[in-house]
């Protein structure tokens, strides 16, 4: 995922920062506990496509 793109993308709900999970190919919003998929290198920033992250499991902002 392009670092410049990550700098401009925000959560469509809260407008907060997103963190890239390289292993899962998702962009994570820790505030809303949502994970947005990346398909064929393209972030799918639709709320209907997002999945809930596991409650209480913090996502590493460094993408590790």
From Swiss-Prot:
Highest taxon, organism lineage: Bacteria
Cellular component aspect of the GO annotation: cytosol
Residues forming coiled coils: none
Membership in a protein family: Belongs to the UPF0434 family.
Name of the protein described by the UniProt record: UPF0434 protein Bcep18194_A5877
């Amino acid at each position: 995922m392009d670092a410049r793109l990550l700098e401009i993308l925000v959560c469509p709900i809260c407008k907060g920062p997103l963190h890239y999970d390289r292993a899962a190919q998702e962009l994570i919003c820790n505030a809303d506990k949502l994970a947005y998929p990346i398909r064929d290198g393209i972030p799918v920033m639709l709320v209907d496509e997002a999945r809930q992250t596991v409650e209480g499991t913090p996502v590493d902002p460094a993408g590790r």
